[in-house]
């Protein structure tokens, strides 16, 4: 049995990890993107403006990691949204729809007790490299 290749995906266009983890890991054609806060890559600080701005920045960061892996948002098949306040769900959805416009990935959303750096939203994603065709079952 041949072994699968594990490759670390990293880009300076997304925030550096704030703990012992990689921005993303590619195994075979699957990319596992670590949770992204609404952090500015240059300053390492949360962007001002509340949950909508944090969600935009988190998704922008995911987009840069996807680009580093040769992908874009159409390659995302699963996302997880962590919220400091579940009442922000619809606000984050409004931002989310600007990045995922059709053939939405599977997704879960949870309220958590707290997020790193006092963030209001964190988003992680799983994507698959290569062209994807959407089919109806």
From Swiss-Prot:
The modification N-acetylserine is found at residue 2. InterPro entries: RidA, RidA_CS, RutC-like_sf, YjgF/YER057c/UK114. SUPFAM superfamilies: YjgF-like. The modification N6-succinyllysine is found at residues 13, 67. It is found in: Cytoplasm; Nucleus; Peroxisome; Mitochondrion. Catalyzes the hydrolytic deamination of enamine/imine intermediates that form during the course of normal metabolism. May facilitate the release of ammonia from these potentially toxic reactive metabolites, reducing their impact on cellular components. It may act on enamine/imine intermediates formed by several types of pyridoxal-5'-phosphate-dependent dehydratases including L-threonine dehydratase. This is 2-iminobutanoate/2-iminopropanoate deaminase. It comes from Bos taurus (Bovine). The gene is RIDA.
């Amino acid at each position: 049995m041949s072994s699968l290749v594990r490759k670390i995906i990293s880009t300076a266009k997304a925030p550096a990890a704030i703990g012992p983890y990689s921005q993303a890991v590619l195994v075979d054609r699957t990319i596992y993107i670590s949770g992204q806060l609404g952090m500015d890559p240059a300053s390492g600080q949360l962007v001002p403006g509340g949950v909508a701005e944090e969600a935009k920045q988190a998704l922008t960061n995911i987009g840069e990691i996807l680009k580093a892996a040769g992908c874009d948002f159409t390659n995302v098949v699963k996302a997880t949204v962590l919220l400091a306040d579940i009442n922000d769900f619809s606000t984050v959805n409004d931002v989310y729809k600007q990045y995922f416009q059709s053939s939405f990935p599977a997704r879960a959303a949870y309220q958590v007790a707290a997020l790193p750096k006092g963030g209001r939203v964190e988003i992680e994603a799983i994507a698959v490299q290569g062209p994807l065709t959407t089919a109806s079952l």
